[in-house]
Amino acid sequence: MRPPHRTLNSHQVHRSATRYLQEHLPLRDYKRSVTIRTLWAVLLVTAAEVGSLHATCQWLDGLPAEETVRQAVYACLPDYAELQRRLNRARAGRLPKALRRRRQRLAIDLTLIPYHGEHFRDPTEVYRSKAKDGTSHFHAYATAYVVHRGERYTVALLPVRRGAALADVVRALLRQSRSVGVKPALVLLDRGFYAVDVIRYGVSQSSEQERTLRLNSLSD
């Protein structure tokens, strides 16, 4: 018997996401001008729109000055490595148990977000690739995900820096997937991962009993 489904409206999704993320990434009020509620509204809209803090501050009404919001975000967030760990724990906490019961078809994707600005602290933050939308500079991240009963579940997430060896990215995503209990029966790779080091890694893994790694294009 299929479990019952119910449709959530945008307000319910927003409240649920805020409550759950606050448990794993506790933010705090910044002075008197930026409350926890405001911070999460800004961060969730920015993430949902795959946009910038600047664009969100221009779009939402009733916010403090953009620079004040920016300072509040920087004051509340932990360092980059700790932020990744907390968000990965949050993501893993809501994976269906069924994903851990048997090996899954795991798809690995490389996402490039065009970026026209400068790096924040380290030049390797900005990835270089074939020009798109008028730039060859991107913020890049890689994901490993499973499609289960028509829903996509991201089981591993990793930022990709300029100069990163793609085979190391694949290896790290598979390691993350195993750490949350999801083991691949088959790995499908986006064509962005078609590189000599990745192919060599795939060949080296094909004889292992622990998993099977096959190269397949996720896009034309």
Regions found by a protein language model. Name each.
Residues 150-156:
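Gly-rich Lys/Arg/Thr-decorated short loops/hinges at beta-loop-alpha junctions or inter-strand turns
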Residues 41-42, 56-57, 102-116, 144, ...:
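Short, conserved catalytic/metal-binding motifs centered on acidic residues
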Residues 43, 92-95, 171-178:
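Generic structural signal for well-ordered alpha-helical scaffold segments
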Residues 45-49, 58, 62, 76, ...:
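Short secondary-structure transition/capping motifs
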Residues 66, 71-148:
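Active-site-proximal, Lys/Arg-enriched surface segment
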Residues 4-7, 156-160:
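N-terminal-biased segments
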Residues 157-220:
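An internal, acidic/charged active-site-proximal segment
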Residues 1-74:
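Gly/serine-rich nucleotide phosphate-binding loop at the start of the catalytic core
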